[in-house]
């Protein structure tokens, strides 16, 4: 092969290794990004689905539960059976002897077998025990006019609004056959949280603890965490690709400029 010359060019040290490493890193990063997005979608949609099964939203039209729940507030009620209701719960119920065409939101202060009266030193008493009610409006007393001692029949509930002076609650129905009480079976939900405006979960009614166990909070916080974490993973995983490509292009330009300067 006369007349021909062979010129061998040595590969640049480290060039192939750098490119291979970048490709390997990019592939791993893309896989992790895909996993993050998939997990995020599962958490996000799973949180919404769980919430739809467990909770039902309600809009409270009156101020009878102020300051716990104001008129127009949007709340989440955990779907429960009436036998799950405990003292201190804020519940949603329907009783046509109270309101014919709407649900009502009030606080349970006594259950079947309890004796409720008002007032001892300005406090509501249940089974002779004065109840500490920090959720009442500032400066408000629990004292109500024309509130005789009531023994709650089995299977029924005695309910009051937190804004005692203006609430049409059990005290407004004392002359009814049920003495102002409501059947447990009328309850459809227990209010866990106020979601609009975002006041968060209701405080536990610890003043009733001496009379028996309180209801356990629902999964509102867990569901909220799932939705938020899922959203973060979807956004973070989805943003990885464009950011990684931008960084790769920046590194490539840097290597090209460095090679041209040699």
State what each model feature region is.
Residues 2-262:
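Extended hydrophobic leader/signal-anchor segments used for secretion and membrane insertion
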């Amino acid at each position: 092969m006369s007349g021909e010359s062979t010129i061998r060019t040595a590969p640049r040290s480290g060039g192939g290794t750098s490119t291979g490493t970048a490709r390997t890193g990019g592939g791993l990063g893309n896989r992790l990004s895909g996993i993050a997005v998939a997990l995020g979608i599962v958490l996000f949609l799973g949180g919404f689905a769980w919430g739809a099964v467990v909770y039902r939203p309600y809009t409270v039209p009156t101020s009878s539960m102020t300051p716990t729940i104001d008129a127009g507030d949007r709340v989440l009620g955990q779907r429960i059976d009436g036998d799950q209701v405990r003292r201190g719960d804020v519940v949603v119920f329907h009783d046509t002897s109270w309101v014919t065409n709407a649900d009502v939101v009030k606080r349970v202060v006594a259950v079947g077998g309890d004796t409720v009266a008002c007032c001892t030193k300005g406090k509501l008493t249940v089974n002779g025990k004065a109840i500490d009610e920090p959720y009442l409006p500032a400066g408000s007393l629990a004292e109500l006019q024309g509130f005789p001692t009531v023994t709650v029949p089995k299977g029924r509930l005695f309910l009051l609004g937190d804004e005692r002076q203006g609430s049409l609650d059990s005290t407004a129905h004392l002359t009814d056959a049920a003495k102002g009480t409501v059947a447990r079976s009328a309850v459809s939900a227990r209010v866990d949280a106020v979601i609009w405006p975002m006041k968060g979960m209701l405080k536990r009614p610890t003043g009733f603890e001496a009379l028996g166990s309180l209801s356990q909070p629902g999964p509102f916080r867990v569901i909220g965490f799932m939705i938020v974490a899922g959203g973060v993973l979807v956004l973070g995983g989805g943003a990885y690709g464009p950011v990684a490509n931008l960084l790769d292009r920046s590194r490539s330009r840097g290597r090209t400029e460095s090679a041209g300067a040699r």
